[in-house]
């Protein structure tokens, strides 16, 4: 940030709406950026768009690169561990982003309360998530907003 100020530049952050809503920002990374270009875009939409762009480049190098990005678990780690595996997977800690993004949308857009969120989630995701997981994730997102 000091360097950006010295040369009249900006520190661009890559954090998205999902991370900001959950308070899951990297300190002195996304958290300290001067301009967050993705802050109004949920993580599930980012992934969808990357997948869409990838589909436009079938059989080309860009498709392989973008699919590798999609296949890599979401993680704040910038480098792999010694055995080339990512140890800290964000969704193992905060839960599925597709649920959080669903909750954020329905809470902000429609003002849904926990009971209604639960019912809509059961309808939207059918049997993908069990009752306890949904309740746990609804509680998690509500605590993030308190």
Task: Give the location of each predicted region.
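ATP/NTP-dependent adenylation/nucleotidyl-transfer catalytic domains that generate, transfer
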Residues: 1-146
């Amino acid at each position: 940030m000091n360097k950006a100020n010295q040369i009249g530049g900006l520190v661009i952050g890559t954090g998205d709406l999902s991370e900001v809503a959950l308070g899951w920002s990297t300190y002195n990374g996304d958290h300290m950026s001067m301009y967050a270009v993705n802050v109004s875009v949920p993580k599930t939409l980012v992934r969808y768009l990357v997948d869409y762009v990838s589909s436009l480049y079938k059989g080309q190098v860009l498709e392989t690169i973008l699919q590798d990005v999609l296949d890599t678990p979401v993680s704040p780690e910038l480098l792999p561990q010694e055995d080339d595996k990512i140890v800290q997977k964000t969704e193992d800690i905060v839960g599925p982003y597709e649920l959080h993004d669903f909750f954020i949308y329905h809470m902000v857009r429609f003002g849904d309360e926990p009971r209604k969120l639960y019912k809509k989630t059961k309808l939207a995701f059918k049997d993908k998530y069990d009752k306890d997981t949904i309740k746990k994730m609804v509680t998690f997102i509500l605590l993030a907003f308190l």
